[in-house]
Amino acid sequence: MLFFSFYKSLVGKEITVELKNDLSITGLLQSVDQFLNIKLKDIKVNEEDKYPYMISVKNCFIRGSVVRYVHLPAEDVDVETLQDHSRLEAREQKKQNKQHQEQTNQKSSNTTTTTTV
């Protein structure tokens, strides 16, 4: 959820999305969802000669699973806040894993097996 929240804060900013098929699209971030699907408006393809059919496209929806990189303007990235939230999320995940492990151990100790001879 960290990156989802981070991308939501960038709505309205210009970003470049590089796809796994080497197509790079620059546009204004209109929306992003929990699957990191991205909706861009006023797009420009970085290599118009290579992708001439994309010249007439003005808006696009990009499935999150086809994204290789998202290039962001440096001035829009608050690195300290991002690092703090990353640490907090990692700490919470570690705590949840520990609780899950304790529950699993407790269940296995409550289960008894009997054998008859």
From Swiss-Prot:
Q: List all Basic and acidic residues biased stretches.
A: 83-101
For the region Disordered, give the residue spans. Answer: 83-117
Q: Report biased composition (Low complexity) as residue ranges.
A: 102-117
Q: Which keywords, in A-to-Z order, does the entry hold?
A: mRNA processing, mRNA splicing, Nucleus, Ribonucleoprotein, RNA-binding, Spliceosome
Entry's Gene3D superfamilies?
Answer: 2.30.30.100
Origin organism is: Dictyostelium discoideum
* Gene name as annotated: lsm2
Name it.
Answer: Probable U6 snRNA-associated Sm-like protein LSm2
**CDD domains in UniProt:** LSm2
Any Pfam family matching the protein: LSM
Q: Which GO terms describe its molecular function?
A: RNA binding
The Sm domain extends over 2-76
Instruction: Provide the family line.
Output: Belongs to the snRNP Sm proteins family.
